[in-house]
Amino acid sequence: MQKNEIKQSDMKPLIIDSSWTERFLPDPPREKDNRPPFRRDRGRILHSAAFRCLQAKTQIHAIGENDFYRTRLTHSLEVAQIGSSLVAQLKFLETFESLSQTLNIDKNELQKQLKPLLPSNDLIESLCFAHDIGHPPFGHGGETALNYMMAEQGGFEGNAQTFRILTKLEPYTENAGMNLTRRTLLGVVKYPALLDVASPQYAELNFSRNIDPRFVRIHDWIPGKGIFRDDLKMFNWLLENLSENDRTLFGKFKKVRENPAESLHTRFKSLDCSIMELADDIAYGVHDLEDAIVTGVVNPHQWQAAHSALKQIPSAWLQENIDSISQRLFSDKHFERKQAIGALVNFFITNVRWKLTANFDEPLLRYNAELSPEVIVALGVFKKFVWDYVIRNVDTQRIEYKGQRMLTEMFQIFESDPERLLPRNTANRWRNAPEERKKRIICDYIAGMSDAHALRVYQQL
């Protein structure tokens, strides 16, 4: 966005509409329950079965069986801690400097105006606790398997499943999931578009679905990002108080699809979501690297290219510290590695700043958190290293491929005789669902499994 697109005269007074604390179903506090709305949301997520299940979902599949490595549960706890630190950092005057130059408004005035917009600790922790609960067993392999099986019924994607769990599946209410506040749900939605629109248009492609599940190519069935069409009612409710301009702008894609194999990604997210996503990226780039180093998945020789790339970034802190950081990352002394990890996390957190997204009417959409340009590049180096040497590690890929096979075969088995093989409650839901939604019931059941549970069920079958 050009600096002259939004001028000081365009700045609208900061108003946080009370509708953001509304819930889909009336839900008055219990007697003598004086907790604010977002603390109640935090409690519901923390005590949910979907959150507990994260303890049995591995963050990195190639690092072996020991007590050190992170699960998706410990990852989510670390994301919450980083998220709270980012919120605290965004209250300081220096984080408004770039936005002040963009809008030609005094940064003290911006600080006074925008600080009340920041999420509370309860809210940001709610988002960070919830952000991974829709991810299926066996990582990308599991996601691909379910997307392959659901390609003709709207597809499957982990973020979409998170929204579905929060708004429908988690049995806090009969049909509205956890019945969370509107602002909490807005903060969880990373991609505000329908998945079947954002995903590759499989009907126009020549990908065969009549093949042995052992030979499904993962790259042919990587899903897009969005919300299931089955959950459109709750998505519409979430956005119903936005202006028509905001709803249209919020769902815009970054580009126009040029061929049917392309996935589309939306351009915008809420302020709260941008903070949560930064926290997730920092945890992924730094803490997952720590796991890989400790367990021997990566070595100093492999790190050299990343080290050289970081040396080229015009950051005074990196120029001064990256040699020492790299040495301590691979030190035999655990405390030195922990100090290096802590220094990196602090570097990313303290370089967060406010940014203007677009001329939204809603302040929660008008502003986001971001890292400064050189720090974005640095985080990208860390994320790429984890992707290249950890996620794409052959051991990781073999485990995910095995999971992909298991989930695809389980889906086919359940679909062949669901009333016999599905658990009673799931079978009842399948029986009562309209024909076009029966496969979604099977998908929900499999997606909710942990890695170990999926393996046990597969062995039983």
Swiss-Prot record:
It holds the Pfam family HD. The keyword tRNA processing does not apply. Residues 22-41 are annotated as: Disordered. It comes from Haemophilus influenzae (strain PittEE). Residues 24-41 have a biased composition (Basic and acidic residues). SUPFAM superfamilies: HD-domain/PDEase-like. Belongs to the dGTPase family. Type 2 subfamily. Disulfide bonds: none annotated. Keywords: Hydrolase. InterPro entries: dGTPase (IPR006261), dGTPase-like (IPR050135), dNTPase_2 (IPR023023), HD/PDEase_dom (IPR003607), HD_domain (IPR006674), PHydrolase_assoc_dom (IPR026875). Residues 72-285 form the HD domain. One of its GO terms (biological process) is dGTP catabolic process. One of its GO terms (molecular function) is dGTPase activity. This is Deoxyguanosinetriphosphate triphosphohydrolase-like protein. The keyword Kinase does not apply.
